[in-house]
Amino acid sequence: MDEPSDFIRNFGIIAHIDAGKTTLTERILHETGQLRVCGAVEDGTTVSDYLLQERERGISIVSAAVTCPWRGYQLTLLDTPGHIDFTAEVERSLRVMDSAIAVFCAVRGVQAQSEMVWRRAAGYGLPGLAFVSKLDREGADFEGVLAQMGRLFGKTRPLPLARPITDPRGRLLGILNLLTGELYGPADETPPEEDVELALWDGRRILLETLAECQDSLLEDYLAGRFPDRGALDMAIRQATLKNQVIPVLCGSSKEGWGVRTLLDAVVSYLPSPAERMASPWGRRTFPALGESFLSPKGRPYAVMTAVKLVRSPWPGDYLAVRLYSGTVEAGMLLRDANRELSWRVGRVWRLRASDAEEIPSASSGEVVGLAATPEEPLPAIRAGDTLLEDGAPVLRLAKMKFPEPVLSLVLEGVDADDRKNLPKALETLAEEDPTIRWKNGPRDGQCTASGLGELHLQVVRERLKSEYRVKTRAGAPMVAYRTTVASKCRLEREFRRQLSPALTVQARVEVEFEPLPPNSGAVVEFPFRESTTLPLECCEAIQQATTEFVDGGNPTGYPLTNTRITVLEVSSVSPDTSEPVFLTATRLALVDSLEEAGEVVMEPVMRLEVSSPAEQIGAILNDLSARRARVLQVDALPGGGSRAVALVPMVEIVSYATALRSISAGRALFTAEPAALEKRPGQDK
């Protein structure tokens, strides 16, 4: 018997900036009956780009969840940003989606962000579809994009299910569905019948040849030169897609609506249901505990979900977007955050439509919905990736989300007294929504230091402070977000003693341990002393506060710690009158001396830089990169006579790279940069 989740498809739309993700989302909403008229990115009228900054800039900044029906199925899609500075939105979308649609521009081909996002999708084992859009544009090159896909997808082979038919000048005459033999596309001219027959024969030959290599069931048909019936073909395509052996490729134009209905049919036919995703190798590794044993005393599954993001909006109000992996959630249910040891009661359940929502009584396993708190209490401090459990469920923590560390910082100062007063709270609220925003109090009163993933990211932070929180700011020059780690393991104790009077001496002893961790581990802080201590709660909190401040940059280097485990092992005092300030001081002494003993190492962020330019300019670009301490990884040709260079380069060397590249290339080159690694900053003593 079919389960309700068999008729659910959750997928993210991923691509490079300006490839057409948001336009495709608009067209999907139109085709599924959710929109009478499609909005336009250039007019700022799209459903999924609802932030003021998105509509002004014409780009997606936050991921937007939209639920719509198609042929008896419930589709939930996430339109994700295409700019590298908003990687967190893409990362958490990939974590909770069951599949992905990669959108490629038929003119520009496989661009840098497309490649980066697909690598991350492949890391989650996501099956997917590809849609080559903008075939209505001059210079569209479907075959060239297909060849690039073959290099990008690695062992997963592109499987074209449709092909464009063009005249000798490259003008699009029609798009051929290889499964049905039907034509769609421009209505003003029909391609010659012999061209259609040749394209159909050749396209089906390649389709069958590709499938026969990974699906034995079609090998006999291929060897006999026979095209299988539609049912057998769909089954073979579906099985190969779910095993990540192929990625079906559709094509058309989102703006004109060509190929979108065919794409939606492919979504329900070939992409996995939530249950199939859970049964995949990735699902079994990630959710080993969600089996028959995870049932309530009533015999039904406990509700288990992952927090995707906190959304603050005028309508429908603040809510938490979640993905359910088990059970049912409904209004009035008490939920427990397994990561933060806090509970809260669900007030409303929302079906999401970007900035809009529809209230529903409940949601079940496989769905992506919004949960609001009751009117009596606000949403608690739940972070993206936290595991939420129905009250009474056994303790379970699902795999957490990982986000890149900030690479750039700005010192912000409120313009007037009210701005300076409200700035910290506004930054704290933004950081709750976006886990890649970090902030701390600045070097002077009224100042804060905000850190993010790039210049655009921090520009948007300032714009949102002004438009959403009415906080106007002045900003200093961008600064690279360095980090500190340690070279070796160190364990020591320090004692702080002070005589307050001839008869009263206060004393505290703190023992700590520093240990280097592998790359991308972040800072891990542990307080095992609390398991056996008899110290008052206030003293324990003072010790934890001192340690947290030290990790966040309150140390001799001035930079936050990373790739380091700090363990506060023992804390003791012989004087019952010892207060919090004494423990605070003793902890800081132990931490500072331990950092020095372990060998502090300042790390600089290194970026993976990709530059695309006309071929004749790539030499000058490479010379400039060499002067910026770049390590060139590859240089290759692009369709249309362009060249691409990929290099690793320290962030400090490319803070103002956009201006320099514009000068070198006369404005004809483009670049993207994504965090790649942390490396030891030059000039430090060994």
Residue ranges of predicted features:
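Structural and coupling elements of P-loop NTPases
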Residues: 1-686
